[in-house]
Amino acid sequence: MVSAISAYPNSQIRLLKKLSAHTKILWSPNITLGINFMILAAKTLKFIAPFTDIEIVEEHFKLKPETSGTAIQISNALELEPENIKSIRAGGIIGVHEIIFGFPFQTVRLKHESISREAFGDGAKFAVEELVKQENGFYSMEQMLGPYFIDSNKEFMPKSQAPKLSLGKRVSLKLTQGFNSLLNRRMGGK
């Protein structure tokens, strides 16, 4: 089962986790690949530079009343308080999320914009294709994307369990491995 509902009450999350003992369940408040890659990149940047000020700006259509589930997902992933989320409501914006890292003399901005709702369909297709390869359990998009992004974080699936990669994904993985090597040197590793 793949769910992209923005927010569940805690009681329903507990129920999904209980059901996951008998089936495979993936829940993500935002199922797009881009937003989930951005979250992984943001977690990496926060790990490298934990001293930065971090703010989240989310933009949606004029009539959306609540803070987006995606902004809350980003906030939780980065272990930030809800006060770090700023909301803008205007026109027919499908969804824009920006994570701003404030360094003393510069900023780094990671931004994702959904320009078509097809992005959600592509993400759902990827989620289903990856989920069927897993054991019964409760999964996130981060866990499905982890093998394609960075394999040094213990909460992600081991690289040995990663699915076979297409040429494009192999190129992306090589770039990521190069980035990981650079990070390891930066952090004093091998």
Regions found by a protein language model. Give the residues of each.
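Rossmann-fold NAD(P)-binding glycine/threonine-rich loop
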Residues: 5-25, 36, 44
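Short, ordered loop/turn segments at secondary-structure junctions
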Residues: 5-8, 30-32, 59-61
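Rossmann-like NAD(P)H-binding beta-loop-alpha module
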Residues: 37-51
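Glycine/charged-rich beta-loop-alpha catalytic/anionic-binding loops adjacent to active sites
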Residues: 18-27, 103-110
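Long, low-complexity, intrinsically disordered segments
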Residues: 168-190
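C-terminal substrate-binding/catalytic lobe of Rossmann-fold NAD(P)-dependent oxidoreductases
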Residues: 50-159
